[in-house]
């Protein structure tokens, strides 16, 4: 694990420096959670003006993470999950999506009308599904294709 962490920090630091950013990489091993079935390496970038590394809805961050995983896992000939974050953006986004899901569910429960959320990547749709899976008045469905795939929050019939 130490070798992987050192290599990942080195490669990520070098990559973001070549992209024109001045950022510190903080590495830590995390225990399994809702998004990860096993221990994973979290690399959190800290610095000024790093918003461009996140990109629209985290797209740039996800692409950077994908490339780093490929580079590290190919060099070490083993696969371990690596999560790249910028100043805990992913955690803040998860909290925002959970709150959005709960507010939207309340709206659907009151109105009795379905509500479609904005298109989201698979990991974000999963957070919404998990946030509402035990809700007494609504259920969720995914619809659409590819990047246009989104969640529909539907009222349960028969009062829950």
What feature does the model see in each segment?
Residues 1-160:
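RNA-contacting regions in translation and RNA-metabolism proteins
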